[in-house]
Amino acid sequence: MLIPARLKQNDEIRIIAPSRTLDCVGGFAANQTAQEKLTQLGFKVTFGNYVSGMTLDGTNSISERIDDIHTAFSDPNVKAIQTVIGGFTSNELLPYLDFDLIANNPKNICGFSDFTALANAITAKTGLVTYYGPAYITLKMLDKAGAYQDNAFIQALTQKHYELRPSQTWSSDEWFLSDSKRTFYPTAWKVYTSGRVHGQTVGGNVNTLFLLAGTPYQPDFEDKIILLEFADDGETWLDFSRLLAQVLQLAKRPRALLLGR
């Protein structure tokens, strides 16, 4: 596996939009708090040329998105790459990625949701460790959920070893709206099979993950710790149930299975 160098103070983080753009979520002004937070944490924030603007599906063209990815990996000053948000179409970029360029310039890259396709493809084709974590706009959360997220994000990208403990609370609301009233619930994990394991993790958003099935970008699930999350907006537990069945048919002997939302 290729493990990118840990982030240090004053390192540059490049923001890109492989799926939806900043214009889908209010533009630069509405997300200024995210940039301010990264700056306060000691990092330099720069943006790809195509993080704004969009077509009917909320993205920019394939060639523009590919250009931002390749430019970020090529730039020696960039030490980490973070996606704006998720979306629906990062998988259409995969045939056009220069995986040799990425492998020769390993960097930290982080995002969530639709980023699953990009993250797993990069790892499958290059061996580069990728990070399933906060997207750029989630950094504007200033409440206790934001504090937990920020701490985990910084630990993952700056430390070689750290202990990740579950958040004490969770919410399912419109966190991205500044005037949204948030309701937090106590975290209640349910353990079906207890034990201790170590190994490599693979996974992400389960809906997006299976866009890779049968392609050269499908991850190797065998003997892995599988992490899966499922968005609860507009879909049911029945949808998740059949996707989970497919996971278990692809991975005959996973080391562990962790489920989230």
Label every PLM stretch briefly.
Residues M1-N77:
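ATP/NTP phosphate-donor binding region
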Residues G26-A34, P186-D233:
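Conserved beta-alpha junction segments in alpha/beta enzyme cores
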